Amino acid sequence: LSIGFFLSSPIHAEAIDCSAPGHSLQKVCSASFSKQRDHLDNLYLTSLLVTDAPSRIIKDTQLMWVQRLKQCKSIDCIKQQIDLRADELNIFVSLNQSLTQHYLKFERGAFAQQQVHMKVHQLSKDRIKIEAVAYRNPNNRLDAQSIAFLAYTTPNQKTEVTDNEHDCKYQFNYSKAILSVKTVQKGCERFAGIYRLYD
């Protein structure tokens, strides 16, 4: 009986919840975006079922994305945000995440106002790639909506990291489920802060 229940129960996950009355995503929930919502719902569900990344990182990056989506003031902004989220979900589905540690920046127990998603990839026994995206206002021009971080290092030197994108030097302090990132350089503070590990 229990096996039959699981086989007959459809699994459904919505990328955008349009069921709540008076919600702040009315434009996105309009009929004109139904195809994009369906596509995003399918990608979201697929990423939850297929990826080897922790499902919590997919759910929390989804919550962060919805926060950015709510800031959109134009149809173009909404379209861009949907496309960007589809790209992010495709990465979760298509790339091996088993050797990747995901971190989100937190402040006072919640997502940081300046949202940052950092990934630490173990490329080989002696090579680590660290990449991050700091999200900015989604109403900015597409090329000004985020700031990238990219660094390559080794396991022995993963506490002293230089961002190749902006030549910023950081001190990384890893402790269990927390990553503390510090810098003394002016203009490099965007990626400094406390990050929570998703595993």
What is each model feature region?
Residues 1-6:
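Bacterial N-terminal signal peptides
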Residues 9-14:
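Sec/Tat signal peptide C-region and signal peptidase I cleavage site
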Residues 17-59:
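Amphipathic, heptad-repeat alpha-helical segments
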Residues 21, 94-117, 195-198:
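Tryptophan-anchored aromatic micro-motifs
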Residues 55-58, 89-104, 118-124:
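N-terminal helix-cap/turn-to-beta initiation motif at the start of protein domains
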Residues 59, 67-69, 134-176:
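Contiguous, well-ordered beta-strand patches that form the walls/edges
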Residues 142-157, 183-199:
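Edge beta-strand at a domain terminus
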